[in-house]
């Protein structure tokens, strides 16, 4: 399957999922208010961080390990999904007043959703992955429609999402991968020690990367208000999320394709250049679209609260460009680079989040200033990372050609 076709299948499903996500935000804002949109965004961010903390990068092993280790890897990931999630939600309960039972089930089931996705990537089942991705936001929207009160929504969402993901796992899992030994403690212990370098470096990097992405919503809710977080959530959903989904679609395809190249000790530098050009082109078009089109959409189809989000959308433009043009290429460092280099990239981004949404609001509580600092620092940082990745890809190509 070609790069464009593989990425397009995942990207098309993501566009459809984005439509359901948009309807969820629209319905929630009109039915319950923008502050509840902020609380929903807070809950989702906490769940997404928890899913990555629970797996701790172990899902990246699913497409990379040999056939004999797939069963061990899946069992290891499932144990993490439920055991680590319990500890994570217990810690979160000290900082936020959230419905713990629903947050726990959501965190564990979103972890299993990632497991299912990466098993589909291993098998290159892009059509099935696309359908799964559409079904997840559809369940959220249906759960909201079925909720007479916003408090009921989280419990209905948690239960329905768990049933959905269990169905996908049952439908898509090849049970011939598993043996009785895969479920034994000693087998899991040996698996952990064999891959502990990956888990400690790549796992930490992935958790930090996800925290850098989700923490702004959490911290805006904390420092400013759920209403301001609602504005940020609207821009995230209608401007940033499509960008992240498109970038993730390319990243998922290249991760699957280049992981196979890694196993075969090759590197397709021509395809790397095609991906690079594709990302920069669509990033430029996306930024122009947000600048000119989003204000018109809010003016003609939104209300006063939606119009208030236009300023946020324009402050986010440098961040949007970096997320689409530069960030998906970090998969090269993830597969072919050293674990420490990928970890360093993510730690530097987390420091930018800390500087923009912790230090700045602590000394001067100004939402626009914090957001502008965050977007400019992120764009500058990822541009430097982008330049380094290009140099490393060129060296990698030359090294392989010499072999």
Residue spans of the language-model regions?
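Interfacial segments at transmembrane-helix termini and the short loops linking adjacent helices
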Residues: 34-35, 93-107, 113, 292-321
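Interhelical loop/hinge segments that connect adjacent transmembrane helices in multipass membrane
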Residues: 1, 101, 127-132, 150-157, ...
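Helix-loop junctions and terminal segments of transmembrane helices
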Residues: 21, 48-69, 235, 239-265, ...
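Membrane-water interface segments that mark the loop-to-transmembrane alpha-helix transition
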Residues: 5-18, 42-98, 264-289, 345, ...
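Membrane-interface junctions at transmembrane-helix termini in multi-pass inner-membrane proteins
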Residues: 60-67, 109-131, 318-347
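Signature of the first transmembrane helix
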Residues: 2-56, 200-227, 354, 358, ...
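Hydrophobic faces of transmembrane alpha-helices in multi-pass small-molecule transporters and flippases
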Residues: 3-20, 100-104, 127-131, 187-223, ...
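Hydrophobic alpha-helical transmembrane segments
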Residues: 130-177, 348-352, 366-391
